[in-house]
Amino acid sequence: AKTTPPSVYPLAPGSAAQTNSMVTLGCLVKGYFPEPVTVTWNSGSLSSGVHTFPAVLQSDLYTLSSSVTVPSSPRPSETVTCNVAHPASSTKVDKKIVPRDCGCKPCICTVPEVSSVFIFPPKPKDVLTITLTPKVTCVVVDISKDDPEVQFSWFVDDVEVHTAQTQPREEQFNSTFRSVSELPIMHQDWLNGKEFKCRVNSAAFPAPIEKTISKTKGRPKAPQVYTIPPPKEQMAKDKVSLTCMITDFFPEDITVEWQWNGQPAENYKNTQPIMNTNGSYFVYSKLNVQKSNWEAGNTFTCSVLHEGLHNHHTEKSLSHSPGLQLDETCAEAQDGELDGLWTTITIFISLFLLSVCYSAAVTLFKVKWIFSSVVELKQTLVPEYKNMIGQAP
């Protein structure tokens, strides 16, 4: 998905949203990519009573909201400013909101109609495990105590279904209510890209609100999985970290879990899927364990579920060999090899020098013997030569 700047909507309350002299203002940041955005109020000087809710990804774009509770004022000059920054698109937006008392006359407040309905995909593990039941979830938030119950309708590829399970609405920390409906679905319906629609209706809504979701379109690509043991710098601490790197997969729906000697481990954290420049995704998972448990030789396994994998599952294990430190062992082996090499070189040089000395001594002895023989032969031949000269006529 390409970088998309957010649209920012100021949310002013109606009279029902006010409690005594306090009023809650909101700021909706919609349709941006990628994360993150930052939301502050009055450039950060207003921090009390601020609640910023997690971003929700829908149709490859993010939406989040932030609210602040402030004293109400009939004076329009007293404004509150919502400051939104989206670094990825270099976007900065400031929206002013006037906390007016809607009960006064002749003041008439108009509140923009903003959807409070969200739809969520099934968990990847539920989709890829045949014994589990995947569910698409529809959530309605910020329901007033005086609002009537909401009604949910569900559609699969525009065909209405009646198998959803709707929970009783629950009161939230800010005295509003939340209502949730879950639709159990078939594993293959999600994997095959069917479209799921949630329609919400209430007497408090001017019209029904619809939200639609389906699996990200595109050819699945299996992830590459790598496990990384603790770095030697961590071995001086009581706890060490094991890392699992999962790269080059598509779509982003993935489940990463850890096991310890075949049993589920709990003390791990996963990053959210992060998009590569080629459109694939990668994830890191970190498992913290006691150093003593690592040094005891226990087996730790990184388990990955993704639709691109054969049987949708793969895993990689790692364990510590007692007394083995890779860097130290390599260094010791290298030192041993060097010592052995120098010993071999020394012996070779010594034997070479001895061979040269021996050859030189033998050669010298032979030369001396030959020279002596030649001299002796010469002395024998000279008198005979002289006698032959004297006998000549």
From Swiss-Prot:
- Indicate the principal place this protein occupies in or around the cell: membrane
| Region feature CH1, mapped onto this chain | 1-97
Keywords, comma-separated and alphabetical: Cell membrane, Disulfide bond, Glycoprotein, Immunoglobulin domain, Membrane, Transmembrane, Transmembrane helix
**Molecular functions per Gene Ontology:** antigen binding; immunoglobulin receptor binding
Question: Where on the tree of life does the source sit, at the highest rank?
Answer: Eukaryota
List the membrane topology term(s): Single-pass membrane protein
Hinge as annotated region, ranges: 98-110
> Any ranges marked Cytoplasmic in the topology annotation, and which?
358-393
Name the cystine pairs: C27-C82, C138-C198, C244-C302
Q: Where in the cell is it found?
A: Cell membrane
Q: Which stretches are transmembrane?
A: 340-357
Residues covered by region (CH3): 218-324
By its UniProt entry, which Pfam families does this protein fall under? Answer: C1-set
- Annotated PANTHER family: TAPASIN
What name does the UniProt record give this protein? Ig gamma-1 chain C region, membrane-bound form
What organism does the UniProt record list as the source?
Mus musculus (Mouse)
Designated gene of the protein:
Ighg1
